[in-house]
Amino acid sequence: MDFLNASDQNLTSEELLNRMPSKILVSLTLSGLALMTTTINSLVIAAIIVTRKLHHPANYLICSLAVTDFLVAVLVMPFSIVYIVRESWIMGQVLCDIWLSVDIICCTCSILHLSAIALDRYRAITDAVEYARKRTPRHAGIMITIVWVISVFISMPPLFWRHQGTSRDDECVIKHDHIVSTIYSTFGAFYIPLVLILILYYKIYRAARTLYHKRQASRMIKEELNGQVFLESGEKSIKLVSTSYMLEKSLSDPSTDFDRIHSTVKSPRSELKHEKSWRRQKISGTRERKAATTLGLILGAFVICWLPFFVKELVVNVCEKCKISEEMSNFLAWLGYLNSLINPLIYTIFNEDFKKAFQKLVRCRY
């Protein structure tokens, strides 16, 4: 979210010329990422707005996440590109304050949205009946408002401490000399949400797996009951079971309670039902793997994109002798920004309704 800076004043014209190709490459690469992030998040927002089928409280959270990531792409990334390429801040301290404020608030808000979505999905799968009544547009709006308010409260202290010291006009950074402020902001913006997300998605996976198994067992029991036929005549009873027809003949006799004769006969119908049951088990297993893959992508992308940056933020503050290069600092910041590009892909690519909505938008069928 913040960058170190350098100056080109001590470089010769030849050195500047030699560095020009790399600067152009960096500029084009980062501009491409910013454009892709803007486009994809715009598609998600437009799809939810124009597609009636997507007007669901759960998707309102995804829409709000897309808006947040869109703001990162439009208001944060372009200034960062200029800062990296120029290697100094040339837009004044007022604009610097605005940029840092938007940067920290939007990135924090994007992360907290992931926590809100995880909480929403957890309650939807573990308390489906009760939560279905509470899962209204108003409820989604309250969750979104809470996320934004918390983001502002988490982001303000670092900006406040920035003005307690002196800063150069050609730099735009958050100082790493207030350990309390850094711990407060990093734990509030990342580490606490990370723990919450890990716990929630672990519980979601376990709950989803249990639900799949219960549904499969319920289907098998239902098939057994539907396939049973009872015929009674006086003291005789015949029981036919579709899975493997069993003939049970019970006769009353003074010397014995009953005599049983068992014979098993395979039938085409029983084999057909067995085949259907096997297919359902296969489908259930496929869905379980798909759910695990989706959760793995969500968690993996989040951790890979943001963990290195926030580890750096803590290490640089706690360890006075620990230094990090400008290039590495920029790379870690943009690795975090990359999460704003990945979010809309992960949260919509596995949803058929979103896929159809995207196709209609691209083909201009609205």
From Swiss-Prot:
Motif interval(s): DRY motif: 120-122
Name of protein: 5-hydroxytryptamine receptor 1F
PROSITE patterns named in the record: G_PROTEIN_RECEP_F1_1, G_PROTEIN_RECEP_F1_2
Gene of this entry: Htr1f
UniProt keyword terms in alphabetical order: Cell membrane, Disulfide bond, G-protein coupled receptor, Glycoprotein, Membrane, Receptor, Transducer, Transmembrane, Transmembrane helix
Protein location: Cell membrane
Gene Ontology molecular-function annotations: G protein-coupled serotonin receptor activity; Gi/o-coupled serotonin receptor activity; serotonin binding; serotonin receptor activity
Any GO CC annotation of this UniProt entry: plasma membrane
Disulfide bond residue pairs: 96-172
Tissue: Detected in hippocampus.
Topology, Extracellular side: 1-24, 82-96, 160-178, 316-327
Presence of the UniProt keyword Glycoprotein in the record: yes
Binding residues for serotonin: 103, 107
GO BP term, example: adenylate cyclase-inhibiting serotonin receptor signaling pathway
Functional summary from the UniProt entry: G-protein coupled receptor for 5-hydroxytryptamine (serotonin). Also functions as a receptor for various alkaloids and psychoactive substances. Ligand binding causes a conformation change that triggers signaling via guanine nucleotide-binding proteins (G proteins) and modulates the activity of downstream effectors, such as adenylate cyclase. HTR1F is coupled to G(i)/G(o) G alpha proteins and mediates inhibitory neurotransmission by inhibiting adenylate cyclase activity.
Glycan-linked positions: 5, 10
SMART domains: 7TM_GPCR_Srsx
Main location: membrane
The family this protein is said to belong to: Belongs to the G-protein coupled receptor 1 family.
Chain segments annotated as transmembrane: 25-49, 60-81, 97-119, 140-159, 179-202, 292-315, 328-350
Entries under InterPro entries matching the protein: 5HT1F_rcpt, 5HT_rcpt, GPCR_Rhodpsn, GPCR_Rhodpsn_7TM
Protein topology in the membrane: Multi-pass membrane protein
